[in-house]
């Protein structure tokens, strides 16, 4: 079946500077949707940047959500172009503060319901941030791990409790696939493990599997219908939005290279 995904006017992406709890200043891309009550934080992979999320960010913004995509410390516009940056081991766990600063930014703008989506270490960081913040309402984890540079997730998924979470991993990405399998068994709320084939790792899967962007968007928007018939979260409340069709059935979407 098809469920409507609401669409509304979005503002162009803007560059902002966020300050974390330890005083680190980081760059972030923001796509604001006017009067949005829902928002999403998007967190990139190691060696990548906020721009990896540009297409998904625009889609979410046009669907009525405000979006913040931070550059993690030592990444993106936080460092000179083509610089050879060595990130201290102790800084990896501190990167959860970038997620927290992004969540705070959205709440300060009036967003009431914040979700997080991350890829690879970004998935780990989102899960850890949500474990510490019971007001984060929803998660999407692309290629999560169990422990990367001290950013652990098994205890975090248990602390996350009964909130919704979407796991996505490709069978050819053995470590992430096994990690997601472990985490899925420990999740206690609404959950789905989307298994892809030959789709690679992290945000690369969004390029290699045409159905994935629609699944992620509908999960974050709360229009995804589980096989039980339940919706993942409340529908967006923008009464003046224009509907567009997005596939949101509870069946596994077909995977493509």
Task: Report each predicted region and the residues it spans.
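Catalytic histidine-centered segment of alpha/beta-hydrolase-like enzymes
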Residues: 199-209
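Gly/Ala-rich beta-loop-alpha elbow adjacent to hydrolase catalytic centers
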Residues: 117-126
């Amino acid at each position: 079946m098809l469920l409507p995904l609401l669409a509304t006017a979005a503002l162009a992406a803007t560059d902002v500077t966020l300050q974390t709890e330890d005083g680190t200043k980081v760059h972030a891309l923001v796509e604001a949707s006017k009067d949005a009550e829902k928002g999403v934080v998007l967190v990139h992979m190691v060696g990548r940047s906020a721009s990896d999320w540009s297409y998904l960010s625009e889609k979410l913004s046009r669907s009525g959500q405000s979006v913040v995509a931070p550059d993690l410390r030592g990444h993106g516009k936080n460092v000179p172009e083509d610089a050879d940056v060595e990130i201290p081991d102790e800084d990896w766990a501190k990167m959860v503060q970038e997620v927290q600063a992004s969540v705070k930014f959205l709440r300060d703008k009036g967003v009431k319901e914040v979700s997080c989506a991350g890829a690879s270490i970004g998935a780990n960081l989102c899960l850890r941030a949500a474990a510490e913040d019971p007001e984060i309402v929803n998660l999407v984890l692309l290629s999560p791990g169990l422990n990367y540079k001290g950013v652990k997730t098994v205890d975090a998924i248990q602390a996350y409790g009964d909130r919704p979470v979407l796991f996505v991993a490709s069978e050819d990405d053995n470590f992430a696939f096994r990690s997601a399998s472990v985490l899925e068994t420990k999740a206690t709320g609404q959950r789905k493990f989307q298994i892809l084939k030959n789709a690679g790792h992290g945000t690369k899967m969004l390029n290699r599997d045409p159905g994935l962007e629609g699944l992620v968007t509908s999960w974050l928007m709360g229009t995804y219908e589980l096989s039980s018939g339940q919706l993942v979260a409340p529908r967006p409340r923008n009464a003046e939005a224009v509907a567009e069709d997005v596939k949101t059935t509870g069946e596994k979407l077909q995977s493509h290279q």
